[in-house]
From Swiss-Prot:
One of its GO terms (biological process) is cytochrome complex assembly. This is Cytochrome c biogenesis protein Ccs1. Keywords: Chloroplast, Cytochrome c-type biogenesis, Membrane, Plastid, Thylakoid, Transmembrane, Transmembrane helix. It comes from the Eukaryota. The gene is ccs1. Pfam families: ResB (PF05140). Belongs to the Ccs1/CcsB family. The chain crosses the membrane at residues 12-32, 71-91, 157-177. The keyword Transport does not apply. GO terms for cellular component: chloroplast thylakoid membrane. It is found in: Plastid, Chloroplast thylakoid membrane. May interact with CcsA. It is a multi-pass membrane protein.
Amino acid sequence: MKQSVLRFLADLRFAISILLIIASCSVIGTVIEQDQSIEIYKLNYPLTNRIFGFLSWDIILKFGLDHVYKTWWFLGFIALFGLSLFTCTILQQFPSLKIARRCQFFRTTQQFGLLKLSRNLGNLSLSQLLFRIKKNQYSIFQQKNIVYCYKGLIGRIAPIIVHFSMILILIGAIFGALNGFKAQELIPKTEAFHVQNILSNGQLTRIPKVVSRVNDFWITYTKQATVAQFYSDVSILNTEGNEIVRKTIFVNSPIKYNNIDFYQTDWNVIGLRVQNDTSSILQYPLINLTNAGNKVWVTWIPSDSEFKKGLTILVDNLQGYCSIYDESGIFVGNLELNETFNLNMPITLVDILSSTGLQIKTDPGILLIYTGFLFLMLSTLISYITYSQIWIIQTNRQIFVGGNTTRATFDFEIEFLKLIK
């Protein structure tokens, strides 16, 4: 019973079936948005108009289709596929390698009929033939008048390395799904923050108590006044508030600390600081008018003490100025930092408040995954090494010689013909 179960797990058809199931689940995870809020699913998958007649937000949440790659059943399929690979390696690949290492002598000349490449030699001595074979880097084993030769045995290890690398990748994926997390924070510059806004996390995840600070944030622009790159000066602090690590990050250049990555992902303008005629500094919030494309923020600043008249302020960049419009919507000028504008009452632009969007994530399985892919590439190179075998039987004045190879048949035929020439 035990042997039959293990052989069933090691069967190639079973492994392919599990792989197809995993691929189908991955397609579902690609089509359905992952790790979104319930409101998003209620909006896109309503109960009244079910997709395909059955798919709605309640079904998605019930079966965990909103986080497919972290569900117990998806991780179970991955574990089952890994178990199938491991069983196949133990029951099939290692025995095949063990057989390949043995001296597989041909005892009778009739066995040469099973080979596609064989010859009967009468004009070449055995010592000459063995010298040529040895010169071609073959290992030679001889018992009286029978000889067995092979080379490229390392090529037979490639399938084992493939299985090993895939098992490493699967273990890394499971470990990362169970212990990793992803968070998104929008932090005003000069502010310190903890990791709080968790977007997704695994069942065994422990959120690190890391204190960080955004020291500064700025944007560089192209000649066409479009955003070229945005930067955040980020510090990692210890429990006493002292700086441990500091780095200026930008898109695709994160700061790393204790296997936690801080990525630059977004930015926002949140307010204006204005000094009025009484030298008081007031802060006005900015509202974003667009969700995509060109970003524009707007606020309203009163120009009299009764709040009946005012100025509309527009900000569309972080180049240190804002645009001013009067009550009729007529453009009256730009106001730069530390510049004073006078319309009914003087106002001075003190600062444009910005915030940076940071994605904070950790994936403890990434090292295993990278190592697995490294071995996978190594196995690809090793698989190009041809495993070739040559058998020889000497009877009276005749020499029977034949050969076989796992790949590169044409090259082996040329080599074989040169050996017996």
